[in-house]
UniProtKB/Swiss-Prot annotation:
GO biological process: protein modification process
Signal peptide: none
Cited PANTHER family: PROTEIN NRDI
NCBIfam families tied to this protein: nrdI
UniProt-recorded name of the protein: Protein NrdI
Source taxonomy: Bacteria, Pseudomonadati, Pseudomonadota, Gammaproteobacteria, Enterobacterales
Family indicated by similarity: Belongs to the NrdI family.
Length: 136
């Protein structure tokens, strides 16, 4: 049990980060008409949009994915990408999703992340799943 579900825009920053993690992962489609349904618990990784406020921070595709009750019931945590140029609002999508889905905001990284971010997330995700009840 260690699935990563992620959304990445055409910039591919989040996609490159997830690829470097080397963990099992599925991507939420860019095309909003395509639907993804998952059948196991997962950690969601999303970029943050907008200027640091909550309105528009979460990508529409991620909202649509989480509006599926089945998918929403399986989220266990969130990691957000952002840009420090937005000050305190960087990585805001993680705050929004953590609050609305009642899951922990596990980590945030800037743009494509650094090698330290990759190592921290890889280790943190492994430890997170080890702490989860096996029947979830």
């Amino acid at each position: 049990m260690s699935l990563i579900v992620y959304f990445s825009s055409r910039s591919e920053n989040t996609h490159r980060f997830v690829q470097r993690l080397g963990l099992p992962a599925v991507r939420i489609p860019l095309n909003e008409r395509e639907h993804l349904r998952v059948d196991e618990p997962y950690i969601l990784i999303v970029p943050s949009y907008g200027g640091g406020g909550t309105a528009g921070a979460v990508p529409r595709q991620a909202i649509r994915f989480l509006n599926d009750v089945h998918n929403r019931q399986l989220i266990r945590g969130v990691i957000a990408a952002g840009n420090r140029n937005f000050g305190d609002g960087w990585g805001r999508a993680g705050d929004v999703i953590a609050q609305k889905c009642a899951v922990p905001y596990l980590y945030r990284f800037e743009l494509m992340g650094t090698p330290d971010d990759i190592n921290t997330v890889r280790k943190g995700v492994s430890e997170f799943w080890q702490r989860q009840p096996q029947n979830v």
